[in-house]
UniProtKB/Swiss-Prot annotation:
Gene3D superfamilies noted in UniProt: 2.60.120.970, Cystine-knot cytokines (2.10.90.10)
Native species: Mus musculus
Cysteine disulfide partners in this protein: C409-C475, C438-C507, C442-C509
GO cellular component: enzyme activator complex; extracellular space; vesicle
Name of the protein described by the UniProt record: Bone morphogenetic protein 6
Stretch forming the signal peptide: 1-20
Disruption phenotype: Deficient mice are viable and fertile without displaying overt effects in tissues known to express BMP6, suggesting a functional redundancy among the factors of this subgroup. However, these mice show a significant increased liver iron content.
Pfam family for this entry, one: TGF_beta
Gene Ontology terms: biological process: BMP signaling pathway; cartilage development; cellular response to iron ion; cellular response to mechanical stimulus; endochondral ossification; eye development; immune response; inflammatory response
Gene encoding the protein: Bmp6
Amino acid sequence: MPGLGRRAQWLCWWWGLLCSCGPPPLRPPLPVAAAAAGGQLLGAGGSPVRAEQPPPQSSSSGFLYRRLKTHEKREMQKEILSVLGLPHRPRPLHGLQQPQPPVLPPQQQQQQQQQQTAREEPPPGRLKSAPLFMLDLYNALSNDDEEDGASEGVGQEPGSHGGASSSQLRQPSPGAAHSLNRKSLLAPGPGGGASPLTSAQDSAFLNDADMVMSFVNLVEYDKEFSPHQRHHKEFKFNLSQIPEGEAVTAAEFRVYKDCVVGSFKNQTFLISIYQVLQEHQHRDSDLFLLDTRVVWASEEGWLEFDITATSNLWVVTPQHNMGLQLSVVTRDGLHVNPRAAGLVGRDGPYDKQPFMVAFFKVSEVHVRTTRSASSRRRQQSRNRSTQSQDVSRGSGSSDYNGSELKTACKKHELYVSFQDLGWQDWIIAPKGYAANYCDGECSFPLNAHMNATNHAIVQTLVHLMNPEYVPKPCCAPTKLNAISVLYFDDNSNVILKKYRNMVVRACGCH
């Protein structure tokens, strides 16, 4: 009576579960059929054999995607770098990644914090003045994209807004550079208020530019000048890494001015920027005046000086790049130290330090680098398989009967995540973008939702009569948008670049 004994075991187990206050006793083993129903199959010898698990997937704001294998990720990185026009992955000295400190006892942690406070260690690269200025430019571009295609969600990760928030990348203090409590030197923004770092002129330059680069001051120690120029300050910038084909459309030197509260609080200052033409060992350097500004002692904000002419010269002939000099003169003709006039130098707060920014426009069409042979072979094999499928489908007019069950040509979602590619240490913004793609059937009759061209309509009719000789129209993008990418280069300079035709806005039959 094997069946009766098994039922008796089950009754005893349930009785113990009801009458016991502690955990239930061990459940008796199930028959093979019940075990299979529970999700685990028993193989030969009683060993468990589990069904093959699906490949791991991730989700990003509603997008589900398969994790790339190592070689797939490497190939994807190479191809996207080629699209971005970069020969290799940038590795900035001061990027976005901060090394995680080791876990220390509380007493040692307190000592370490005191040492860091005394040392005033520099913050991450993203919290300095140049990256913050570039981030404002990036947000200005992103806001324009949102106004142009708010209904499309173009270039954004779903659930996000195209621009990167400045508050996410910086923690402003009460005396931060962008808090202008007195008369501002900044031009009012489009909304009537003063922008944190950018001005209306910067926005105009941005509309005409394909790329914007910021440059940090390379001078670490003040130079000994002659008595006549003893209050001059020197600045040098490296413009040797400008991509080929880029021409300077505008360039600015930006320096922050604090409110003067000392002995010069009622003064008016003439601030001048000079290009160094030639340096001499025993006399003053030869200088060329580039731009001047007259400011009051009570004014506070960013000063902008036009250095477009000298920047073009430095790009064409780098050997002439001997830097800039800044001088400050009172209305009485007295040369004073720039610090006495409220100008912040390299030893000031990191979000107020001077920097240079240049706007570029491409002078020739960018040509992508040649792909590897393996990529071409894979593409050719895919093309051959696609052609064979097209030949097999084009056997007669019955193709249209089957295509009615297929999806019509339309836009589909495709999200490219820079973070999943491991680029979060050098790409400041965005974290990724919605590239999208076009797919679907272009079958007769072509309705208005397919955005078909007149040529596509004629080709569809001819294909209907001669499917063996004339293929159907293809589902392809009809409108493409650009994206903007903000990133560090190898020298920790910040670059904002526009990339055209990166986002599919609409699809149609061609």
